[in-house]
């Protein structure tokens, strides 16, 4: 059997970015044949990716790309916050955002089929994703994306966990300020008329329950409910919210935009992991189960 040297392991690691021990194992199995070891790693890492695919991805990053009046916003998920800070993972998200903007894929599957390189050759985005899963040992997925075109665009990223793209006409500085405001205050619609009916009904139900508990007469309780709903609508409607940078603490976003002669036509807000049920590990229960299983086997 051929001797496996440190330089051979280093060379294979440089080619594959696989963990050091995995490289050594592959070289040993391939009897020192670098090309064969590389192929073995590719198969092994692919298998590793397959095993990871079923695990929940509730962490990750939001990335954006804007070029003129074309842009994109994308959320790419990972299992842990640690991986979401990995440079290769962040690069994957940024590349995906650019591909969405430039190629307008119909869905995640179509996005994955696009070449990772802008030169249109080499591995696809999906192949790069699977390769990263194999190297890192953690599942990752393209959760959602949106493409924008035909309008002036402004974006704001709060770290890598919150991303906003605003479609507007007028002053770019004002639009960027609004994007930052949206990231901070998280409105659900431009105006109260745009708030989804199901959200209003949910708020009305909660308000009605509170009013019933108050023991007030029916007419007063009804006014309490309506007051709560109207307050909620102002709190979640962008134009009615108090602008986060308002000098007087009173100016609304709508008033600020009017003063800046700027119109916001729409916005998209992504928050990493929003709506995803995260897995909670109960280590005490897990240990207890293992002890019980060991006793049963004894």
Swiss-Prot record:
- Which keywords fit this entry according to its UniProt record? Cytoplasm, Elongation factor, Protein biosynthesis
Q: GO molecular function of the protein, one example?
A: translation elongation factor activity
Q: Where in the cell is it found?
A: Cytoplasm
The Gene Ontology CC terms held by the record are: cytoplasm
Region named Involved in Mg(2+) ion dislocation from EF-Tu: 80-83
What the entry lists under Pfam families is as follows: EF_TS
Main localisation, per the record? cytoplasm
Task: Please give the superkingdom of this protein's source.
Answer: Bacteria
Q: Which InterPro entries match?
A: EF-Ts_dimer_sf (IPR036402), Transl_elong_EFTs/EF1B (IPR001816), Transl_elong_EFTs/EF1B_dimer (IPR014039), Transl_elong_Ts_CS (IPR018101), UBA-like_sf (IPR009060)
Q: Which PANTHER family match?
A: ELONGATION FACTOR TS, ELONGATION FACTOR TS, MITOCHONDRIAL
Role noted for this protein: Associates with the EF-Tu.GDP complex and induces the exchange of GDP to GTP. It remains bound to the aminoacyl-tRNA.EF-Tu.GTP complex up to the GTP hydrolysis stage on the ribosome.
* Protein family per UniProt: Belongs to the EF-Ts family.
| NCBIfam families noted in UniProt | tsf
Q: What is this protein called?
A: Elongation factor Ts
Name the gene for this chain.
tsf
């Amino acid at each position: 059997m051929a001797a496996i040297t440190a330089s051979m392991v280093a060379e294979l690691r440089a080619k594959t970015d696989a963990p050091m021990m995995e490289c050594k194992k592959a070289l040993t199995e391939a009897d020192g044949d670098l090309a064969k070891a590389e192929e073995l790693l590719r198969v092994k890492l692919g298998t590793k990716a397959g095993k990871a695919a079923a695990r929940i991805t509730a962490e990750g990053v939001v990335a954006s790309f804007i070029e003129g009046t074309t842009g994109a916003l994308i959320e790419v998920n990972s299992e842990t916050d640690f991986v979401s800070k990995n440079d290769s993972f962040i690069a994957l998200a940024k590349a995906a955002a650019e591909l969405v903007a430039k190629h307008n894929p119909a869905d995640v599957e179509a996005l994955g089929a696009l070449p990772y390189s802008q030169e249109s050759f080499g591995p696809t985005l999906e192949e790069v994703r699977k390769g990263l899963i194999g190297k890192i040992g953690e599942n990752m997925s393209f959760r959602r994306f949106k493409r924008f075109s035909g309008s002036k665009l402004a974006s704001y990223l709060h770290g890598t966990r919150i991303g906003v793209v605003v479609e507007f006409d007028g002053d770019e500085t004002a639009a960027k300020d609004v994007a930052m405001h949206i990231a901070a205050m998280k409105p659900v619609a431009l105006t109260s008329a745009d708030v989804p009916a199901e959200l209003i009904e949910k708020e009305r139900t909660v308000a009605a329950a509170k009013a019933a508990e108050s023991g007030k007469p029916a007419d007063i309780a009804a006014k309490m409910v309506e007051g709560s709903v109207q307050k909620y609508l102002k709190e979640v409607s962008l134009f009615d919210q108090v602008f986060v940078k308002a000098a007087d603490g009173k100016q609304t976003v709508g008033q600020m935009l009017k003063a800046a002669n700027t119109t916001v036509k729409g916005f998209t807000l992504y928050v990493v992991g929003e709506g995803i049920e995260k897995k909670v590990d109960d280590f005490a229960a897990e240990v207890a189960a293992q002890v019980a299983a060991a006793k049963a086997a004894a």
